[in-house]
């Protein structure tokens, strides 16, 4: 009997060790994916801020990997760009050399996006075929892969909105493109954190997990509002802080009809909403931190709540500086990077309350 129990325990320990080993490998893979996604969003922000997103006027998922290699090919690519309204109305007289600058930004963004597809799909196939992907993760990972493929279509759908009548892409499509990218990033972070060892600290209060989820959701919503701000160049509407046009609430927020359209197409209203959302998010994070410190100051959850508030404070300072400086490229990119850092940490913090995915046996492991 004792021998049988020992054999069972050894078998169980072997299974746990194998699970831990597989999880470390998948976490390493997801860490690379997260880094690549972060880089993609940053390059995408720089592409937008340099007004380079419309420089490639065709969608060639495979052939588009190869850039122009000869003077003739560059001339042909430039001729395609000269057909769209952005060239006619904004860049008339641009040289081929100047065109190359904006072309390389968009090409790099598309190449990085394609590369992430490979970075995600091939290791996933390997882990799947070798039995390293736990059953509970199969559908979520396939969902992320499918969403990534759909994101490629959304990217072209966004670009196409600026090729016919407009000199820029639709703010609605820009927001959709950025939010989907952030959803993919958040989903990868959620799984990555769920595969990581957790402490056994109890939540500071019964509502701590709910509040962490609200902060994460609000962080994503702020990114959506930020995308509308970017698409409308709303960051140039009021370049003062804390007042807007000398008032807390400016008077021309609902000048368009119907009134609801101002929420999406009035640059001043959209900037006001982005500011208001930032204040709300800041207040929620501050309250969450205070409650966590009072209820359980020595826990990992409380320490994470402090770091989350610090990250939000830094992001707010970057946002205000970006506004006051009238959105220079470096600060605009830094603000977008900060938003993704806040979102990623908010997701990880929220997942910390949920805990890691169950193991083959109920054994607490703390690293």
Curated annotation (Swiss-Prot):
For biological process, the GO terms are: heme A biosynthetic process
Pathway the protein acts in: Porphyrin-containing compound metabolism; heme A biosynthesis; heme A from heme O: step 1/1
A single Gene Ontology CC annotation of this entry is: plasma membrane
UniProt subcellular location: Cell membrane
What cofactor does this chain's UniProt record say it requires? heme b
Keywords of this entry: Cell membrane, Heme biosynthesis, Iron, Membrane, Metal-binding, Oxidoreductase, Transmembrane, Transmembrane helix
What's its membrane topology?
Multi-pass membrane protein
Which residues bind heme per the record? 274, 335
Where is the major localization of this protein?
A: membrane
State which Enzyme Commission number(s) the record gives: 1.17.99.9
Catalysed reaction equations from the record: Fe(II)-heme o + 2 A + H2O = Fe(II)-heme a + 2 AH2
**In Gene Ontology terms, what is one molecular function of this protein?**
metal ion binding
Q: Does the keyword Membrane apply?
A: yes
The transmembrane segments are: 26-46, 111-131, 139-159, 174-194, 212-232, 276-296, 305-325, 327-347
How does it associate, per the subunit comment?
A: Interacts with CtaB.
What HAMAP family does the record point to?
Answer: HemeA_synth_type2 (MF_01665)
Write out the similarity annotation: Belongs to the COX15/CtaA family. Type 2 subfamily.
Q: What does the protein in this record do?
A: Catalyzes the conversion of heme O to heme A by two successive hydroxylations of the methyl group at C8. The first hydroxylation forms heme I, the second hydroxylation results in an unstable dihydroxymethyl group, which spontaneously dehydrates, resulting in the formyl group of heme A.
Protein's name according to its UniProt entry: Heme A synthase
């Amino acid at each position: 009997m004792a021998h049988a129990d020992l054999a069972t325990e050894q078998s169980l320990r072997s299974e746990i060790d194998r699970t831990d080993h597989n999880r470390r490998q998948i976490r390493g893979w997801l860490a690379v994916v997260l880094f690549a996604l972060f880089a993609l969003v940053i390059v995408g922000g720089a592409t937008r801020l340099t007004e380079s997103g419309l420089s490639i006027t065709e969608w060639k998922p495979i052939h588009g990997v190869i850039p122009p290699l000869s003077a003739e090919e560059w001339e042909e690519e430039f001729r395609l760009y000269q057909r769209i309204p952005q060239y006619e109305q904004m860049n008339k007289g641009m040289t081929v050399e100047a065109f190359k600058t904006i072309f390389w930004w968009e090409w790099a963004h598309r190449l990085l996006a394609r590369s992430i597809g490979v970075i995600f799909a091939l290791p996933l196939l390997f882990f799947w075929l070798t039995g390293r992907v736990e059953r509970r993760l199969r559908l979520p990972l396939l969902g992320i892969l499918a969403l990534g493929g759909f994101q490629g279509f959304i990217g072209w759908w966004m670009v196409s909105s600026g090729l016919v009548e407009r000199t820029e892409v639709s703010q609605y499509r820009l927001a959709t493109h950025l939010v989907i990218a952030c959803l993919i990033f958040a989903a990868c972070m959620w799984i990555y954190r769920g595969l990581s060892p957790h402490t056994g600290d109890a939540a500071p209060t019964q509502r701590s997990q709910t509040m962490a989820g609200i902060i994460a959701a609000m962080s994503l919503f702020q990114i959506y509002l930020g995308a509308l701000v970017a698409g409308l160049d709303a960051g140039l509407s009021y370049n003062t802080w804390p007042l807007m046009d000398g008032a807390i609430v400016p008077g021309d927020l609902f000048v368009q009809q119907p009134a609801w359209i101002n929420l999406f197409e009035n640059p001043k209203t959209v900037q006001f909403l982005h500011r208001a959302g930032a204040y709300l998010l800041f207040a929620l994070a501050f309250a969450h931190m205070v409650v966590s410190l009072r209820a359980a100051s020595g826990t990992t959850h409380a320490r994470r709540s402090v770091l989350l508030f610090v990250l939000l404070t830094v992001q707010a300072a970057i946002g205000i500086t970006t506004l006051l400086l009238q959105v220079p490229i470096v600060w605009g990119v830094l603000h977008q990077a900060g938003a993704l850092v806040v979102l990623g940490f908010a997701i990880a913090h929220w997942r910390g309350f949920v805990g890691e995915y169950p193991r083959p046996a109920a054994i607490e492991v703390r690293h």
